Every structure is written in structure tokens, then in C-alpha cells.
Amino acid sequence: MAVNLVAPAADSLLPIDGVDLGWAEAGIRKANRKDVLLVRIAEGASVAGVFTQNRFCAAPVQVCREHLASGQGARAIVVNTGNANAGTGAPGLALARQTCEAVAGLLGIAPQQVLPFSTGVILEPLPVDRLIAGLPAAQANAKPDNWLAAAESIMTTDTVPKAASGTCTLSGKPVRLSGISKGAGMIRPNMATMLGFIATDANVDEAVLQGLVRHAADHSFNSVTVDGDTSTNDSFVVIATGRAGTPRIDSESHPDYAALRDALTGLAQALAQKIVRDGEGATKFMTIRVEGGRSVDECRQVAYAVAHSPLVKTAFYASDPNLGRILAAVGYAGVNDLDVDGVNLWLDDVWVARDGGRNPDYREEDGQRVMKQAEITVRIALGRGDATATVWTCDFSHDYVSINADYRS
């Protein structure tokens, strides 16, 4: 049950010159559902990405890293759902490379110019013959305005397709950005079962784009959590086609750099928050804001401790203002020299804990009033510095257990 999340209108998603998207129903895991996405990328585009930090990273992640490092330039993306091709060893790597060879043959490009992605069940062999059989159909229906269908084609336990568009102005000219994401469970920073793809018609040097991708990921996909599990397949990739006719951004000091950085990060945040809003069984969307830390990392450490806590998440599901659980999470977050007498806690505008203890003016009915809302902000002030960090998360419901217990059935 998604929290204040609906599918976007297809005509609200902006086509990006130099990017075509096509899909197919290949029967990877289930029949009669979109499960293959093919993205054609114009020659000369810059492409950059960041990937899961899980040591058991999937075969397609390994191949993507190799192909991006080859310097040949990415010309296509292929995504399958229903099977993660993870925990599959050398045979899985061979199947990922076979997929790239099939796409390359279809499009007349080199296999190293294809970036493969998979999402779904781990530890099962990829049915590569079905995937390859679906590629001609995906190639045949590829077009620039297929963003909504593309979002539908990468869904697993998602209940809503996730896509968004935005614009910015660079050197006086309009620039477009469009993107899709997927994910609902096994979501934790760096990165989780999340796939995110954004395309823009801005003109960006590839090395500069890599820095922009890292910045956007740190402030979006690496700032969300659903259940604290880090997946094997997470990937976030940005394509810059250069078709907008703007000057090439070749350094961080370029006058257009900040505007593109902010637009890209804003769109990535929107896509990442859609994942949390569609968290498996979610009924609440929570913003965890920690301020007054000595560093951003310290603030994030505290925010993640609160956001990952099953006791905190189930309290929010029940609308039970058992808010000592939040203070307990702050206490075990690992800030060893934290002076708890300086910690303050708010739920929206309700001041719950003051100077390390219960605020004398706090009334439990006020806390419960906030916790009954679908969207809640938890604000924690550490009182030891000027740094801040924000993490987005959701609650744990009975449906989370049911969805994951039934996932393979």
C-alpha cells in the first residue's frame, strides 16, 4: 500500500533527445508482464553510474563496471526483472555477457557498449534464452516517450511505476531530465534493491558526470532505507546526451555545474522517495532529520540507527507514541562521546524530549496525533555542532512479512 504515491501520467514524462526506450514480455519469471527493458543511447553520450557495495554483487553489476571502465562509451542498457543473476558464480557472468552480445548484435554495437542490469530472485540461473528472445520486440517498440512503460517493465514487488521529469536552465537554454526507479524491499544505503536511471539532454564531460552521479546518489538513493538489507544488484546510472545545445560542462567550476547538480539531485531524490513511499507494506512515510552534529557522517549515523530500528518502525505502524525507542536508537548509534543531556526530539512540531529527558510540557495525545498521520518528520537535535543529515524511511506492517514470505510463490 503506497503512501501518497500514484503512477505519473505518461504525458507528464519528458522525452530526452538521444534516448529511446522499449520493453518486452519475455516470461522471465511470470507470463504476461513487462519484464525486459531496452534503452538505446545515441553515440557520443556520456554515461556514469554507481553500484551496490554488497560484496556478493550480482553478475550484471560486475559486467557493468567492466564495460564502463573500458572507455568504449555506453550505447545501450538492458534490464530484466524476475531474476537477479546474483549468487550465480562464473555461469552467471557468462550469461550476463551473453546478454550483452545479443543486444550488441541487434543494435550493431560492441558488447562492451552494453550495460546489463537484473533484479529479482537471487541464487537462481538467469533464463537467458527467454530474455534474448524478447529483445527484438523491445527494439521494435523503442521510442523516446516510453518512460512510463519503461518504469513498469522494471517493477518487482513495486505496486506503482516510479518515474518523474524535471527541467533546468543552463546558459539560458532549457534542459530536460527524466528518470525511472524501482524498489520496494531490501532497501538500504549504498545501495539497496534499487535501480535508478536518469537521462538528460545536457552536455557533460563523463568524468564530471561521474562526480554528479555520486553527489546525487549520496543525497537520494543513499539516504533511504526500508528494511536495512543491502541488495546485490543496486545501480544508479545517468545518461547525458548533449542534445540540448548547451556548452559542455567540463569541470565543477563551470557556470552551469551547480544548476545541473541541483536539478539532477532533486530528480534523484524524488525517485528515491517514491521507493520508500512504495516500501513493502508501508503505511507511513517518515523523514528522519538529525541536526546539531559535528559532521554530516555523524548525523547520518544517528538517522540510520533510528530509521533501521524495527522497534521504531513498528511503533509508527501502530501509531503508538512509545518514543523512548527513538532515544534508545540515538544512544546505540555509535556516537561514543555523545552528551545525551544535550539531545532534543520533536515529532513534527511536538517537542517530545528536552535536554535528554521527557519534555515536561509533552502530552502523549499530541504525539499520537502526529503518529496517526501518513507523513511524519522526526527531528533530532544533538546539540554538539552545525552539521545536518536527512534520511527517508517507512514503517513495518504485517504486510511486509506477508509480502516477503510469499515472494517466490
Swiss-Prot record:
It catalyses: N(2)-acetyl-L-ornithine + L-glutamate = N-acetyl-L-glutamate + L-ornithine; L-glutamate + acetyl-CoA = N-acetyl-L-glutamate + CoA + H(+). It comes from the Bacteria. The record marks 192-193 as: Cleavage. The active site is at 193 (nucleophile). It is an enzyme of class 2 (transferase). The record marks 119-120 as: Involved in the stabilization of negative charge on the oxyanion by the formation of the oxyanion hole. The keyword Repeat does not apply. Its EC number is 2.3.1.35, 2.3.1.1. InterPro entries: Arg_biosynth_ArgJ (IPR002813), ArgJ-like_dom_sf (IPR016117), ArgJ_beta_C (IPR042195). One of its GO terms (molecular function) is glutamate N-acetyltransferase activity. Pathway: Amino-acid biosynthesis; L-arginine biosynthesis; L-ornithine and N-acetyl-L-glutamate from L-glutamate and N(2)-acetyl-L-ornithine (cyclic): step 1/1; Amino-acid biosynthesis; L-arginine biosynthesis; N(2)-acetyl-L-ornithine from L-glutamate: step 1/4. GO terms for biological process: L-arginine biosynthetic process; ornithine biosynthetic process. It is found in: Cytoplasm. PANTHER family: ARGININE BIOSYNTHESIS BIFUNCTIONAL PROTEIN ARGJ, ARGININE BIOSYNTHESIS BIFUNCTIONAL PROTEIN ARGJ, MITOCHONDRIAL. Heterotetramer of two alpha and two beta chains. This is Arginine biosynthesis bifunctional protein ArgJ. The gene is argJ.
